[in-house]
């Protein structure tokens, strides 16, 4: 779960570790995902971020915003420039939200660090780069953020004009479809947290396992009873 870029399915984990009961492996994986989410919740994004939404759920006739039976997921990736001046991705964060409204986007940004300031009084989060969806413009004004709006005349150009955030989204959908063969909407957030945790530590391959063990022993545990409930399987699309 820590080092494989596409994660590991519960069945494969069960086989590798010699765990007899599927339920035991499933619970263990969710305990690890909670530790991942708790550790990443300590961090805040700063400077400029790329931000966009996507839809996770069963395939349907109606694509994009307004899709039925799909969960809205907001994704943000912080950006910085390397020594050669090339834009690079820093930290990624994904969250399941109620809808694509400015209110949902505002709550999302507050979780990322919008509001807290530096010693000089500047916001940690200064600017967002998004497509032209009206909710982003409104939340940028409400939060006093610079808004770098990218006009997408062709939806297929999103991956080129907002490359990092769409790379993270595409990776998440590939993992959910491929490795896990779909996940329930109830537990979608924990899988997204796992995917972001690995992405955020992609340069720490030698340390990531030990860091995850430390996160696991220092987080509040979760029980099987707290995890289960009525749910239906939904494939990412």
PLM regions and their residue ranges:
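Residue-level recognition of single "structural anchor" positions
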Residues: 1-237
């Amino acid at each position: 779960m820590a080092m494989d870029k596409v994660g590991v399915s519960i069945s494969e984990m069960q086989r590798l570790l010699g765990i007899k009961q599927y339920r035991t492996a499933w619970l263990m994986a969710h305990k690890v995902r909670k530790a991942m989410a708790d550790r990443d919740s300590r961090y805040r994004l700063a400077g400029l971020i790329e931000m966009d939404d996507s839809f996770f759920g069963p395939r349907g006739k109606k694509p994009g915003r307004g899709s039925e039976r799909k969960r809205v997921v907001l994704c943000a990736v912080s950006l910085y420039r390397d020594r050669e001046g090339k834009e690079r991705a820093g930290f990624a964060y994904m969250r399941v939200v109620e809808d694509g409204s400015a209110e949902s986007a505002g709550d999302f940004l507050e979780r990322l660090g919008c509001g807290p300031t530096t010693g000089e009084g500047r916001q940690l989060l200064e600017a967002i780069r998004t497509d032209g969806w009206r909710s982003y413009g409104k939340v940028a004004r409400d939060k006093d953020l610079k808004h770098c709006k990218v006009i997408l005349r062709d939806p297929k150009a999103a991956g080129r004009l907002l490359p990092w955030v769409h790379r993270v989204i595409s990776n998440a959908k590939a993992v959910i479809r491929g490795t896990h063969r779909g996940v329930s909407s109830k537990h979608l957030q924990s899988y997204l947290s796992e995917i972001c945790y690995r992405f955020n530590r992609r340069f720490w391959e030698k340390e990531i396992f030990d860091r995850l063990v430390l996160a696991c022993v220092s987080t509040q545990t979760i029980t099987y009873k707290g995890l289960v409930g009525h749910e239906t399987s939904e494939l990412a699309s």
